[in-house]
Amino acid sequence: MGDVIVLYASPGMGHIVAMVELGKFIVHRYGPHKFSITILYTCGSIVDTASIPVYIRRISHSHPFISFRQFPRVTNNITRNISVPAITFDFIRQNDPHVRSALQEISKSATVRAFIIDLFCTSALPIGKEFNIPTYYFHTSGAAVLAAFLYLPKIDEQTKTTESFKDLRDTVFEFPGWKSPLKATHMVQLVLDRNDPAYSDMIYFCSHLPKSNGIIVNTFEELEPPSVLQAIAGGLCVPDGPTPPVYYVGPLIEEEKELSKDADAAEKEDCLSWLDKQPSRSVLFLCFGSMGSFPAAQLKEIANGLEASGQRFLWVVKKPPVEEKSKQVHGVDDFDLKGVLPEGFLERTADRGMVVKSWAPQVVVLKKESVGGFVTHCGWNSVLEAVVAGVPMIAWPLYAEQHMNRNVLVTDMEIAIGVEQRDEEGGFVSGEEVERRVRELMESEGGRALRERCKKLGEMASAALGETGSSTRNLVNFVSSIT
């Protein structure tokens, strides 16, 4: 009878990739003879995409020690005026019987040493306990956001009689270990509206973090503010009870060679060969994640700012969303690039800029010698990819917990410059502000200092995963807790 670690991913490609990377790290360290990895995932979610089965087939082929178990299809309860997160959380709860039967089935032929779940899969926590399986959370953002999530039930308790956070324009919240407070309107998107069922779901999830056997985090100790690590370890984030062990095991990011297999070869080669011809650290890379998208008016402001800055740039432009206020795009249908940019922009900047539609191989781009800065939506995976590559950032958050990440990147970690967003206009950024921040990062002494700091952090990221590194030590401590 072999030993297996079972991982349970939330719906969506990003969540599955995160679990795969954790599984690969465990097996890379201990070998498939010590543990096999089984990843449970759902079927039928409204956030599923056609790329998920393609990705799973590829990983199954290249990493045979990772097996996947897909649950039977479940139908979403789609009700009018209910948010996508609320629908998704209800969908996850409907999969609880499949979690139970999967653990039962796997336990017949193997010893389940640990059950690792995503935060949104909290309804599976008591199921793991029911089987006496040590159950852990995998937190796929940084330690500062973990500190905030652990403390969120306390904030909920203190603000029960107030309006929704989205309406508290003059309110800020203090989190243990954070240097600067966070605007209420910049809280994680899931809790902005008290009347959305996702609000109470998120408070429930966060209140259960301390009830697990431990929390595994995709970051490394050297990246995080010491005050945040101390606040978590010292129990300040869970004032009403014990904090479980926390294991920082990152940075876990997808490998370049695996990413490149899914790329559009011709377009990829074009942008990479263009980068190879540019001077060292001279190019600003702009990319806002797989879901990040802007209305045409904002795209024009970005273009004007880039043109006025005089800097070299590689800019990934996604199709503008159908709803003008939305910042998320679903699908990458073709669109007229010239039509969404200022007239003549592409021609006027052709000697120093390149604009690509929808996608670029981000991990590979960030590691190019010519890249000297990164305008990012502050998704945690993108942040880690920039840190590993030693590239400083301009922080432009869009949704999810990205405003929280921005606060920490700019104020606590000091590895990014924040753009000034007009909250009353949906986070709009003017062309003048784009130019100002681009020049600050690429031309100023402050930008150079940021670049030096990021270069050192890149070296520390590599060391953390080495034989004697902090993340390897933390993985060893986690494995000791389950064997």
UniProtKB/Swiss-Prot annotation:
The active site is at 15 (proton acceptor), 118 (charge relay). Optimum pH is 8.0. UDP-alpha-D-glucose binds at residues 140, 360, 362, 377, 380-382, 385, 401-402. This is Phloretin 2'-O-glucosyltransferase. It catalyses: phloretin + UDP-alpha-D-glucose = phlorizin + UDP + H(+). One of its GO terms (molecular function) is UDP-glucosyltransferase activity. Optimum temperature is 45 degrees Celsius. Glycosyltransferase that possesses phloretin 2'-O-glycosyltransferase activity. Converts phloretin to phlorizin (phloretin 2'-O-glucoside), a potent antioxidant. Is specific for phloretin and does not possess glycosyltransferase activity toward naringenin, naringenin chalcone, eriodictyol, eriodictyol chalcone, apigenin, luteolin, kaempferol, quercetin, isoliquiritigenin, butein, caffeic acid, 2-coumaric acid, 3-coumaric acid, 3-hydroxybenzoic acid, 3,4-dihydroxybenzoic acid and 3,4-dihydroxyhydrocinnamic acid. The gene is UGT88F2. It is an enzyme of class 2 (transferase). It comes from Pyrus communis (Pear). Its EC number is 2.4.1.-. Keywords: Glycosyltransferase, Transferase. Belongs to the UDP-glycosyltransferase family.
